[in-house]
């Protein structure tokens, strides 16, 4: 009698390129709570990287072992940097849209996710439908605090054992 071999189904692998700690904390909780998901968060150690560095990392990851690469960008940061840019110089916003266009045209396994203005707006959408425009992340955070009791933008809040940010938002997905 021959042995039966179980055919292994490959688990898709995902890489996330993020520019802030909030995104890293959320994704770490996703990974902790959804064990079947194979994802990597880049950079592993949060450091303020410019758009050019993030873009280069996205391109490198897209041509490596990952099935899908997600680049999560907070638009409020890009707009702030664009407003502070000297006149006559290409703004970070213009550069970002060029990068986004390149990625959508050339790399099919890359998804650019733009938070407008920040990730907290996406959290807010878990609780209520709104098309309201928020200029600043602080405006969104104020609204979010009404719906997520005790919300604070800290690692301690995001990673609480048995009540982390992912578990609080999951029922509203």
List PLM regions with ranges.
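Catalytic nucleophile-elbow at a beta strand-turn-alpha helix junction centered on a G-D-S/GDSL motif
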Residues: 15-25
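Conserved beta-strand segments of the P-loop GTPase G domain that flank and frequently precede/overlap
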Residues: 17, 71-74
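C-terminal accessory helical subdomains adjacent to catalytic cores in phosphodiester-
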Residues: 2-11, 24-25, 29-43, 57-68, ...
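Eukaryotic endosomal/vacuolar membrane-trafficking regulators centered on PX-domain-mediated PI3P pathways
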Residues: 47-53
